[in-house]
Amino acid sequence: NRKRFPEAAEIIFGTMKETVKNYSIDENSYIIIVTRGHENDKECLKAILDKKVSPKYIGMVGSRGKVLSTYKELLDEGYSEEELKKIYSPIGLDISSSEPKEIALGIMAEITAVKNQKTGEHMRDVRKIDIDNLN
C-alpha cells in the first residue's frame, strides 16, 4: 500500500504467479526472484519458465538446499534440466558477505557480467601486467 511504500513507482496486487504471468518478459529481460518463501519462489520461476522465452538473466535467491529442493520439484513436474541450467541460483558473485548492501552489489555485478558477456574475473587476471619485465 502507499502508506507502507510511499516512494514506490508501482504497487502490484495479486498472487506471485498471477503477477509474473501479467508482466511482459522477453529476451532482453533481467529477472531476480526474491520472495518471502520457497513456494512463492517456485511459483514465480514456473510462471517465468512457462512463458517459453529466454530472458538474458533469471536469478533466484536461496540457499543451496532450497535451490536443490526447488529444482528437484520442478524436474518432477516436467521442467527440463536445460531450462534449470539457465537460472543463476544462488545469485550473485562470491564475495562472501552477509551484509544486504554487499549481497546486492554482488548480484548487480553478476547481472552486469552477464549483460556484458563477461565472467566476473578479476581485472588483474584478465589484463595481466608482467612486473618481472619492467626493468
Give the positions of each predicted feature.
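ADP-ribose/adenylate-binding Rossmann-like module
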Residues: Y30, T35-H38, K46-E73
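Short, catalytically relevant binding-site loops at active-site mouths
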Residues: N1, E18-T19, H38-N40
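Short, conserved active-site loop motifs that form the nucleotide-linked donor/cofactor pocket
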Residues: A9, S29, I87
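Adenosine-phosphate binding glycine-rich loop
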Residues: V61-N135
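Short amphipathic alpha-helix with an adjacent loop that forms part of the alpha/beta core around
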Residues: K17-E27
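Conserved SAM-binding strand-loop segment of SAM-dependent methyltransferases
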Residues: A9-T15
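NAD(P)-binding Rossmann-fold cofactor-contacting core
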Residues: N1-E7
